[in-house]
Amino acid sequence: MTIPGRFMTIDKGTFGEYTASTRWPIIIQNAIDDLSKHQETEKSNGTKFEQGEVIKKELKEFRQEIIDRVPLRPFTEEEIKIANVPLSFNEYLKKHPEVNWGAVEWLFSEVYLYRRVNVLFQRQCEWAKFDIFNRLKQSTFESSFYGVVELALRYENLLPQLREMKQNPGNEIDDILKVLFKEFIEISLWGNATDLSLLTNATLEDIKSIQGAKARAASESKIVVNDTEKAWEVLTKARADANSREIRVDFVLDNSGFELYADLMLAAFLLQSGLATKCIFHAKDIPYMVSDVMLKDFDILVHDLRDREFFPSGEPSTKESRALDLFAGEMEKFVSSGKIEFREDSFWTTELDYWNLDANETKYHGSILHKDLQKSNLVIFKGDLNYRKLTGDRKWPRTTKWETAIGPLATNGITSLSLRTCKADVQVALPEGLDAKLSQEWEKENPGRGSWWCCSGKWAVICFCSGIHK
């Protein structure tokens, strides 16, 4: 089998080319603007304000580098030391000294960009712990208010029923749990507050109704690959075989805000229903991809749920406030009891794809994570960037089998589920003819960009792999 090359920023007509030429300069400009706004609150701290001016100047210069398509430079020894930059970046640039912003692997350059931005803040002691993307994370979560409240109310309503079902297992109960499992998976998949129609039927009778089945069928129509059933089988088998042993589910996280909230909601469902006994969340160690989850973002989210100025749901006695407080309290209990655990690792913010989650990758924690994730019953990889790293961000034919596209992960003992709303050029595992059909459909509204249907966020995939050599 010939392994195809990766998507490049020079590939004409691709979303990667558009990202490098248009989106990245905008992202850096937004960071400059947000830094300026934050500086207004720091004027009394002269040192911090002046250091902010230095960062702002350097961000402007960096933005111009991207626009001018200058060569990507290695990190200096000082930068590596100050910001704990993994040496993998310089190793790549040593092998590819000719690359510039307009002609480089998209995956490498995008990850490199966020490392460069982080270095600028780490150099200035007053700003070393500052998350330049935090304001945007917060404002986006705040705008999800109605979805957050609705999901909290649904969870509160389901909680006693879940506990009852856990105490009285059986085939009929499993049928209901299976429906709920699919719905919580989909909420986590889409990761936004516009898809909560899934849980509008919250009673067990409604879930079993014809109307409920129709709503689910409609919601699944945009999921072009759907292996949810296989994940369900893995967890129910683990539950049957458990005999008091741990049932572990890992989440390799994507976005903070509502998506993290939805991921926590899925974890709470798994724990309350007995489909899992422990959930481990893997976060990023630096501000990354604008909205990715860092360890601090969990505490911020729980605080936001209780903050009646952030989420103005009325007096503490209102049902909305009670539901938000209940879920915040549930999360704290799960964390304090060890049922939910958060971890971070620099591997997730290197440019290395997940073919390096392997016993042979001994330099950047790939082997350590591989050994650990083998202990998990199911590893859920969230979002588009994780999908790109799973597939190597390569130019696979779109009908390529999932097991082929994820390389060593297909057989190295990690049971995985990728939940991805499609926002990049790479796409695999499609049945014959579907790519042409969707390209034609997207072309009608977006002339010349039919193949971008898989970059639009309008479709999604749920891809499972047992990790077992067949």
Swiss-Prot record:
Changing D292A: Abolishes catalytic activity. The keyword Hydrolase applies. A motif (Subfamily III RTxK motif) lies at residues 420-423. Changing K382A: Strongly reduces catalytic activity. Coiled coil: none annotated. Present with 6190 molecules/cell in log phase SD medium. Subfamily III proteins have a conserved RTxK motif about 40-50 residues from the C-terminus; the threonine may be replaced by serine or cysteine. PANTHER family: DAMAGE-CONTROL PHOSPHATASE ARMT1. Metal-dependent phosphatase that shows phosphatase activity against several substrates, including fructose-1-phosphate and fructose-6-phosphate. Its preference for fructose-1-phosphate, a strong glycating agent that causes DNA damage rather than a canonical yeast metabolite, suggests a damage-control function in hexose phosphate metabolism. Belongs to the damage-control phosphatase family. Sugar phosphate phosphatase III subfamily. This is Damage-control phosphatase YMR027W. It comes from Saccharomyces cerevisiae (strain ATCC 204508 / S288c) (Baker's yeast). The lineage of its organism: Eukaryota, Fungi, Dikarya, Ascomycota, Saccharomycotina.
